[in-house]
C-alpha cells in the first residue's frame, strides 16, 4: 500500500505542477491577447481618425469647389439678366442699346456682384459697400 500512496503522491505533484504551468500559460496567453487587442484597437482608432480627417478634408474641398461654382453661376446669371434688361430697355425705347450698361464717361458699368469680396477658403462673406447702390426716388 505504501507504493500505492507514493505513486498517488507523485501523480498529485505532477498534477499540481501541470496546473501551475497551465495557470502561468493561461495568464501569459491572456496578457498577450490583451496586448494584441489593445494594439489592434489603437491601430483601428488611428485608421478611423485618419479616415474621418481625410473625409472631412475632401468634404471641405468639395464645398469650396461648389461655392466657387455657385459664385461663378450667380455672376453669370446676373450678367445675363443685365444684358437682357438692356435689350428690353432698348427695344421699348427707354435707351439706346449701345449706351445701356455704360456710365457717364461711356465706360462699362461694374455690377454689384463684381465688387463683392469673395474668399472661397473663408466661410465668412462680406456684404458689398453701400457706395455701389443708388438711391431711387419714384416720380410723383
Swiss-Prot record:
GO cellular component: axon terminus; cytoplasm; cytosol; extracellular space; membrane; neuronal cell body; nucleus
Sites bearing Phosphoserine, chain numbering: 87, 129
Alphabetized GO MF terms: copper ion binding; cuprous ion binding; identical protein binding
Stretches that traverse the bilayer: none
Physiological role: Neuronal protein that plays several roles in synaptic activity such as regulation of synaptic vesicle trafficking and subsequent neurotransmitter release. Participates as a monomer in synaptic vesicle exocytosis by enhancing vesicle priming, fusion and dilation of exocytotic fusion pores. Mechanistically, acts by increasing local Ca(2+) release from microdomains which is essential for the enhancement of ATP-induced exocytosis.
Residues modified to N-acetylmethionine: 1
UniProt binding sites for Cu cation: 2, 50
Sections of the chain in a coiled coil: none
Family: Belongs to the synuclein family.
Modified residue annotations for Phosphotyrosine: 125
UniProt keywords, alphabetically: Acetylation, Cell projection, Copper, Cytoplasm, Membrane, Metal-binding, Nucleus, Phosphoprotein, Repeat, Secreted, Synapse, Ubl conjugation
Amino acid composition bias (Acidic residues), ranges on this chain: 112-140
Keyword Ribonucleoprotein: no
Compartment list: Cytoplasm; Membrane; Nucleus; Synapse
Region (Disordered): 98-140
Entry PTM: Phosphorylated, predominantly on serine residues.
Gene Ontology terms describing biological process: chemical synaptic transmission; regulation of dopamine secretion; synapse organization; synaptic vesicle endocytosis
Cross-referenced InterPro entries: Synuclein, Synuclein_alpha
Subunit structure, as described in the record: Soluble monomer. Homotetramer. A dynamic intracellular population of tetramers and monomers coexists normally and the tetramer plays an essential role in maintaining homeostasis. Interacts with UCHL1. Interacts with phospholipase D and histones. Interacts (via N-terminus) with synphilin-1/SNCAIP; this interaction promotes formation of SNCA inclusions in the cytoplasm. Interacts with CALM1. Interacts with STXBP1; this interaction controls SNCA self-replicating aggregation. Interacts with SNARE components VAMP2 and SNAP25; these interactions allows SNARE complex assembly and integrity.
Region (Interaction with SERF1A): 111-140
SUPFAM superfamilies hit by this protein: Synuclein (SSF118375)
Phylogenetic placement of the source organism: Eukaryota, Metazoa, Chordata, Craniata, Vertebrata
Name of this chain's protein: Alpha-synuclein
Superkingdom field: Eukaryota
Amino acid at each position: 500500500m505504501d507504493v500505492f500512496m507514493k505513486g498517488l503522491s507523485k501523480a498529485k505533484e505532477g498534477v499540481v505542477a501541470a496546473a501551475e504551468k497551465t495557470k502561468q500559460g493561461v495568464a501569459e496567453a491572456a496578457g498577450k491577447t490583451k496586448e494584441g487587442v489593445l494594439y489592434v484597437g489603437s491601430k483601428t482608432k488611428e485608421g478611423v481618425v485618419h479616415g474621418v480627417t481625410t473625409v472631412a478634408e475632401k468634404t471641405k474641398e468639395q464645398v469650396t469647389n461648389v461655392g466657387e461654382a455657385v459664385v461663378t453661376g450667380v455672376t453669370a446669371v446676373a450678367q445675363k439678366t443685365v444684358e437682357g434688361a438692356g435689350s428690353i430697355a432698348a427695344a421699348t425705347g427707354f435707351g439706346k442699346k449701345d449706351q445701356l450698361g455704360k456710365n457717364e464717361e461711356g465706360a462699362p458699368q461694374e455690377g454689384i456682384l463684381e465688387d463683392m469680396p469673395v474668399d472661397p477658403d473663408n466661410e465668412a462673406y462680406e456684404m458689398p459697400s453701400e457706395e455701389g447702390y443708388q438711391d431711387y426716388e419714384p416720380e410723383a
